[in-house]
Amino acid sequence: MAFLTVFTPAYNRAHTLPRTYESLCQQDCKDFIWLIVDDGSTDETADLVKGWQKEKNGFEIQYIYKENGGMHTAYNTAYANIDTELSVNVDSDDYLTDTAIEDILSFWKKNKRENIGAIYALDQYEDGNVVGTPFPNDLKEFKGWGYKNIVYYSGGKKKVFRNSGDKKLIGVTAVINKYPPIPVFEGEKYHSLYYKQHLLERDYTVLIMNKPVCVVEYMNDGSSKNMFYQYVRNPKGFCNERRYVMKYAPSFKLKIEACIHYVAESLLAKDYYFIGHSTNRLFTLISVVPGVLLYFIIKRKTKK
């Protein structure tokens, strides 16, 4: 059996998937499976994949079609069908570096031990620049609250690394599947993909592989405005994520930010008993006024 599954959720991405496929074909190490989860595509994705499955490319290609439900539901489907030791997501418009599979395998063989839940590696843009901030050289592993705010010890000193930019999670599949699927709310097609990672980082050690393994496309698409629309369309999913953050975040600032968003998104979901449903009622009560203000800002920004 292969040691790694590369899984790719896809929705009408027949025009970008060939680049992902070519990057997999170029790998010297073919000890992996490529799993495409088709999230209800209406383009030529299925025919494209069927053609690739017939080619002598050196690795197994698995294909699952499902009704459109959003990226998080595609993740749930992927994890339910992965049985390799490690798994990594590569989006349908991204592709692997030339030595990614070999680099991951080599790193895992060298550093594998009990109580490891995942590896974080780097993403890079097509121009070679790393996405966000590279990890410090003295940061080898961590356990606790998320890769955005990592507390670690080096040289006998306590240090804090405040990360910017996405990082590539390479999960230990058996650990990831100990946690429940990402919640799905009726009528909503978005939930933070970080759901399982939050739980994993709390319970297991995460290794740091300070090297790019995936090339991502820079999207200058007005994402902040788009996020306002996501709040309106998927308020229950956002509320669910905020409940976790307000309970477990290590700082007052992070908890208050989560509570402010929770208030606004609860109002968008027409949940007027949000204080009773909160996992941090005191902080939520403190956040009511700014949360209501944020609610009106979101409504104004998304007014047609």
For the regions a language model picked out, list residue spans one by one.
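A conserved acidic beta->alpha catalytic loop
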Residues: 23, 38-48, 91
